[in-house]
């Protein structure tokens, strides 16, 4: 699995969202690299890990990342949040957890109302097999929908998407399955490490209310909503997100 290591200081592992790669965090890298050693992961089937045959399953991926990185705060955006949360719940080397636009369960349920309908991910899976590039474009548009900086964020995501080659279709299907079926809510109250949950106020994929509901499950959590932010608030609101991360990491024992 490809992992870029940039900067010096306390370690921070960053895990990207569906169809992207570690390069998507460029605005955060610019601001955080002077203070931290950043470990930017390309998940299997994505970016420079496109040919990595590791199944996109939480235990396998987390174990491989953990073996290649030092004790660190783990940050997960969107799909990457599921891997980061699983790591925080199972590995003592995870010092803290930062979740950006990510919850332990991405689909709506009778006891989890602030989420999207399951059919959203099912339909993306169907469309992906019919129209690969068109489906990716529609997903990127959904990532930025509602954001105060939607145009510039969409432009950035489009440029990033294929900068390291196109993601593997099989990995994309596996990622959609994870988003549709994973429910890690039971692990959150057991988190022994501090956590930070950063939501975008206008996020259409992971509503801010869902982020705050997730944070409320953890005994050591902070929650922050970025005003005007969409599903990728670290793009259009990089200063706010990086400042929040620096405050959080400084507070981690």
Swiss-Prot record:
Question: Which NCBIfam families does the entry mention?
Answer: bioH
| Keywords (A to Z) from UniProt | Biotin biosynthesis, Cytoplasm, Hydrolase, Serine esterase
- The catalytic activity of this protein is classed by the Enzyme Commission as 3.1.1.85
Gene assigned in the entry: bioH
| InterPro entries assigned to the protein according to its UniProt record, in alphabetical order | AB_hydrolase_1, AB_hydrolase_fold, AB_hydrolase_sf, BioH
Q: Does the keyword DNA-binding apply?
A: no
Residues that bind substrate: 18, 78-79, 139-143, 231
Active site residues of this protein:
78 (nucleophile), 203, 231
GO MF annotation, one: pimelyl-[acyl-carrier protein] methyl ester esterase activity
Q: How does it assemble?
A: Monomer.
Name assigned to this protein: Pimeloyl-[acyl-carrier protein] methyl ester esterase
Any single Gene Ontology cellular-component annotation = membrane
Database matches in Gene3D superfamilies: alpha/beta hydrolase
Transmembrane annotation, as ranges: none
What's the main place this protein lives?
cytoplasm
Natural source organism: Xanthomonas axonopodis pv. citri (strain 306)
Q: Please name the pathway.
A: Cofactor biosynthesis; biotin biosynthesis
Its family? Answer: Belongs to the AB hydrolase superfamily. Carboxylesterase BioH family.
The reaction(s) annotated as catalysed by this protein in its Swiss-Prot or TrEMBL entry are: 6-carboxyhexanoyl-[ACP] methyl ester + H2O = 6-carboxyhexanoyl-[ACP] + methanol + H(+)
GO BP terms, alphabetized: biotin biosynthetic process
Lineage, opening ranks: Bacteria, Pseudomonadati, Pseudomonadota, Gammaproteobacteria, Lysobacterales
Role summary = The physiological role of BioH is to remove the methyl group introduced by BioC when the pimeloyl moiety is complete. It allows to synthesize pimeloyl-ACP via the fatty acid synthetic pathway through the hydrolysis of the ester bonds of pimeloyl-ACP esters.
The enzyme's main class, written as a single word, is hydrolase
User: Where does the protein end up?
Assistant: Cytoplasm
Pfam family name, one: Abhydrolase_1
């Amino acid at each position: 699995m490809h992992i870029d290591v940039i900067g010096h200081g306390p370690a921070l592992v960053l895990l990207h969202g569906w169809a992207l790669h570690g390069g998507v965090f460029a605005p955060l890298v610019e601001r955080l690299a002077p203070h931290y050693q950043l470990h930017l992961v390309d998940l299997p089937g994505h970016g420079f890990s496109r040919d990595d045959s590791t199944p996109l399953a939480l235990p396998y991926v987390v174990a491989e990342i953990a073996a290649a990185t030092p004790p660190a705060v783990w940050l997960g955006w969107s799909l990457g949040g599921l891997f980061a949360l699983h790591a925080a719940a199972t590995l003592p080397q995870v010092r803290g957890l930062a979740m950006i636009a990510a919850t332990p369960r991405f689909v709506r349920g009778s006891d989890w109302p602030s989420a999207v309908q399951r059919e959203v991910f099912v339909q993306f899976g169907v469309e992906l097999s019919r129209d690969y590039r068109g489906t990716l474009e529609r997903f990127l548009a959904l990532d930025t929908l509602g954001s105060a900086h939607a145009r510039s964020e969409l432009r950035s995501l489009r440029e990033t998407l294929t900068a390291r080659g196109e993601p593997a279709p099989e990995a994309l299907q596996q990622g959609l399955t994870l988003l549709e079926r994973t429910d890690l809510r039971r692990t959150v109250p057991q988190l022994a490490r501090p956590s930070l949950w950063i939501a975008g106020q206008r996020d259409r994929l992971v509503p801010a209310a869902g982020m705050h509901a997730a944070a409320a499950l953890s005994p050591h959590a902070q929650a922050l909503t970025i005003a005007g932010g969409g599903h990728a608030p670290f793009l259009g609101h990089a200063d706010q997100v990086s400042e929040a991360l620096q405050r959080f990491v400084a507070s981690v024992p």
